[in-house]
Amino acid sequence: MAIQSADHIPILDIGAFLSGDESTAIEVASQLRWIQEEIGFYYIVNHGLSAELIQRAIEQVRGLHSLPMADKLKLKVDEDTTGYVPINSTIYVTTDAGDNDQYDLNENYRIVRERKADHPSIQAGRRFTGPNKWPPQDLLPDFKSTMLEYYNAMENLGRALLPLYARALDLAPDYFDELFTDPTWLTRNVHYPAAPAKDNQFGISPHTDHGFITLLPVSKVPGLEVKTQTGEWMTGDYVEGAMIVNSGDFMQKWTNGRFIATPHRVLAPKEERYISAFFFNPNWDVRSEPLPSCVSAEAPAQFDVTTFHEHLCNYVDRNYSKSSGGQADEQTSDPAVS
């Protein structure tokens, strides 16, 4: 199946590839290469995650955001950058995709990869590596177990996609394996309230994601819009059972601009919208030197080199307010909107 139109978000069927049919790998990688160079967004179908597990996870996210504000604020994000992020906490400034001057109309709960207390990153106090803040079991008895089950499945899917990305970049299929041994993935478990938006205010304002790739199960509640390279905003359709995948800023740096980080936004919905976005990223100390297939005398390196951790800290500190795990200047927030 040829995918050669940039006026809609394409659908990539990865079922045969995930089942081990190597004969499909070259064709699927070729499709992925075109998508990542021209659009940066796509749907995957036959991805292996059950609809039942995804629904259970979304119901837990709904339950968490339905807690009284006093309970949510006890779990508020701090210097460890995990936990509850109130509404009116982000204005995205790390992109020129929009003239963002209003705080976003969403509240979210940030969870990172679960690590033991003696993990070197925990011991070092490294941001975005934990420990997580879990709601008390007497309030949400199944939250932790359900979300860990869901995140484990999402991590497995992210790992399964690595050989496909390697092939798409003309690298050995196992190229990324040693760079994702302890991935710095994080999640945003978001509630977009059905609240009136001000002028130039969004559920989430125009931005590009921070990392390698983002995995997001589709929502029946519309709102996602993706900016094409011609500057038009196209609406993300609902594709039954699909997952949205897009690349972020670190991918763009790592590929020396070859695989693009595409601006997108979410309009304030007319009904409550709940999602769980999974940001699949490499080990914290992976550096953004251009990948071997993405740099040459004709295509010299064009971005400053950082570790992934440095890149992530810069992204969050510039886009998130000081009371929400970042360093951006504060604007009066209204935690009553939930």
Task: List where the protein language model places each region.
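Peripheral, non-catalytic segments flanking oxidoreductase cores
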Residues: 1-338
